[in-house]
Amino acid sequence: MSGGAHEYVAAYVNGENNRLIIYGKALINGETKTKNVYEKASRDYYEDNYNANSSKYGDAVYEVSKSGGYYSSWYGDYSHFPDFYGYFFERGSGYSRGAYAGVLAFHYSSGGSTNGYSFCPVLAVL
């Protein structure tokens, strides 16, 4: 089951990037209970950021992957933990991304809008 849409989720790495402020202002200023905020590692690289947040469970990053990068999610789905390239989380991915797409795929995004991106609303009782 690969392809569909790139889906943004309410999660980001708390890094230093103008795009985080430009595209994520509402998310950053939103209530803590409505988002997952990951800390940036001292070396802002996908594997380091992944390891720095390894105790954070509940949003299907660590539950379905064995490392922060390159086809390490279950069933060989692509993974690239957000880093200096982009601090926003993207899930799934569009059919045009080929091997990058997958139900359990996750990777970074700079946060801008483009064709094929969507947001998957989820209602959770808190």
Identify the residue ranges that each predicted region occupies.
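A short, polar/charged loop-to-alpha-helix boundary motif
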Residues: 15-25
